[in-house]
Amino acid sequence: MKRAILIIASILGFFSVLIGAMGAHYFSDYLVLVDRVNTFETAVRFQFYHTFFLFFLGLSYDFTNIKLLRYAFLVCVTGIILFSGSLYVLCLTNISFFGIITPFGGILLMFSWLIYLYSLMK
């Protein structure tokens, strides 16, 4: 599982850089037109921040509660998908419905940090 966490963190890190570059170069005119540049940058930034969090989870695997660490990992990945993913879709389609999903992803991201904290204290 440790290796899987680090691999998924690497993949998500790669995609955060790729998506950020696409937003800056390929989608920039459209994002300006629909006034979603800041929203897109927030999605990329949060994905990138939580990629590092996933690396910490993977590197913590040997000295913390493995069951809780797995929960933190799954909750974090789900949070990234819901938070950043919904913002990416919102920005690129300009369909406001996807904005409803974003807070649920944010809550999961916060919850993943709390699960990790609890795993360290246990």
What kind of feature is each model-predicted range?
Residues 1-122:
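Polytopic transmembrane helical bundles with strong interfacial aromatic enrichment
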